[in-house]
């Protein structure tokens, strides 16, 4: 049996799924693992990868998660957070189908809206604001300048001449 070296990111031949010995191959496997398991920490993810013969450092894993756009979300009940990767797997604005995905996320995560001046304020369950703000940014809505997210609150800046209240109404319509 041939064994590849762990520092090259390979997997034992005949053990588990075939893994490319590249960053892209490792990241692809990370996406699959996050989809299949409720991963609560980077060390848990590293253990899952190690079980498949993919050794990685915490710094590399952190960089991979960042490049994949992975975020840690908590359920509405405030339970332990789990890592999720955006469906499109891409941190790029204006992804095809962005508004379809945004509508689904708004339906799942939008708790309430408010407005002031040219800003719409969106409330989400704890831990979900960054994820929803990222989806808003990726959707590249023409009437949104940008977003700022905290833990459970998003400030969405309306493009003039739209007001914050009008923007909040448009976002609610998407939900």
From Swiss-Prot:
What GO molecular-function term can you cite, just one? Answer: arginine binding
Region: Disordered; residue ranges are 1-23
**Is Lipid biosynthesis there in the keyword field?**
no
Which pathway does this chain act in? Amino-acid biosynthesis; L-arginine biosynthesis [regulation]
**Gene3D superfamilies linked:** 3.30.1360.40, Winged helix-like DNA-binding domain superfamily/Winged helix DNA-binding domain
UniProtKB keywords: Amino-acid biosynthesis, Arginine biosynthesis, Cytoplasm, DNA-binding, Repressor, Transcription, Transcription regulation
Q: What are the record's GO terms for cellular component?
A: cytoplasm
User: What's a BP term from Gene Ontology annotated to this protein?
Assistant: L-arginine biosynthetic process
**Database matches in Pfam families:** Arg_repressor, Arg_repressor_C
What are the subcellular locations of this protein? Answer: Cytoplasm
Under InterPro entries, the record lists: Arg_repress, Arg_repress_C, Arg_repress_C_sf, Arg_repress_DNA-bd, WH-like_DNA-bd_sf, WH_DNA-bd_sf
Q: Supply the HAMAP family for this chain.
A: Arg_repressor (MF_00173)
Family the UniProt entry places it in: Belongs to the ArgR family.
Function per UniProt:
Regulates arginine biosynthesis genes.
Q: What is this protein called?
A: Arginine repressor
- Lineage, broadest ranks: Bacteria, Bacillati, Actinomycetota, Actinomycetes, Mycobacteriales
């Amino acid at each position: 049996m041939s064994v590849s070296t762990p520092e090259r990111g390979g997997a034992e031949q005949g053990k588990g799924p075939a893994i490319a010995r590249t960053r892209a191959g490792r990241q692809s496997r990370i996406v699959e693992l996050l989809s299949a398991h409720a991963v609560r920490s980077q060390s848990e993810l590293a253990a899952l990868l190690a079980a498949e013969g993919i050794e990685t450092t915490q710094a590399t894993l952190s960089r991979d998660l960042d490049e994949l756009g992975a975020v840690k979300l908590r359920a509405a009940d405030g339970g332990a957070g789990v890592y999720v990767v955006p469906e499109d797997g891409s941190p790029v604005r204006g992804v095809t189908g962005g508004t379809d995905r945004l509508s689904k996320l708004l339906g799942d995560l939008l708790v309430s809206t408010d407005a002031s001046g040219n800003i719409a304020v969106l409330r989400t369950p704890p831990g979900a604001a960054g994820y929803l703000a990222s989806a808003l940014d990726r959707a590249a809505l023409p009437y949104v300048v940008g977003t700022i997210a905290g833990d459970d609150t998003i400030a969405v800046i309306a493009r003039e001449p739209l007001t914050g209240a009008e923007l909040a109404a448009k976002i609610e319509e998407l939900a």
